[in-house]
A protein has these predicted regions:
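Histidine-dependent nucleotide/RNA phosphoesterase domain, centered on the 2H-phosphoesterase fold
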Residues: 1-185
């Protein structure tokens, strides 16, 4: 099973996320994420045996309990790309308020899963974000660059009360997500 740890955006922000995606409508080469599945990935675990799901849920519980992060509000605003404006592979919506709490959760999860569960540490700094689209070819690169450099959408604020261990099943119609474990803050 393919797993990741995330914080989900509420359904109430899906329309606002879709409206931000619409700003890139004329850009060729983008494959959009489903706004109804918007989330901030704290740690991508990859393919793991199904037999480990319960243990990984317990590890997530331990990681969250090791922090002093209580429920908090996160604002979703601004745009960015990975890895750079010159070589765009991902277009994302940023996090304003709440980014420190998300970083603390990420750090705790990464420590737990690397030290105790044998996963590899990520090879890049954590930037809390919601993936809006992936660039499959550079046809729309200039438009994406222009929008990212000139616009600063403010999507809204959401109360973050839980972290989820989520299974991602890849299909021809896009990924299907199923919650394996929810850990309340």
């Amino acid at each position: 099973m393919r797993l990741f740890v995330s914080v989900d955006l509420p359904d109430g922000l899906a329309d606002a996320v879709a409206a931000v995606q619409d700003r890139f409508a004329d850009a060729d080469g983008l494959r959009y994420t489903d706004p109804g599945q918007a989330h901030v990935t704290l740690q991508f675990l990859g393919d793991v045996p199904e037999s480990r799901a319960d243990d990984l849920g317990d590890a997530l519980e331990s990681a969250v309990r090791a922090t002093d992060v209580a429920p908090f509000d996160a604002s979703f605003e601004g745009l960015g790309v990975f890895p750079s404006l010159e070589y765009i592979s991902v277009v994302w919506l940023g996090v304003g308020d709440g980014s420190e709490e998300l970083a603390a959760l990420h750090d705790a999860v990464e420590r737990q899963f690397v030290a105790e569960e044998g996963f590899e540490p990520e090879d890049h700094d954590f930037t809390p974000h919601v993936t809006l689209a992936r660039m499959e070819h550079a046809g729309g690169k200039q438009l994406v660059q222009n929008v990212v450099e000139r616009e600063h959408p403010e999507v809204g604020t959401a109360r973050v009360e839980a972290v989820r261990l989520t299974e991602s099943t890849l299909t021809d119609d896009g990924p299907v997500y199923e919650t394996v474990r929810t850990v309340r803050l």
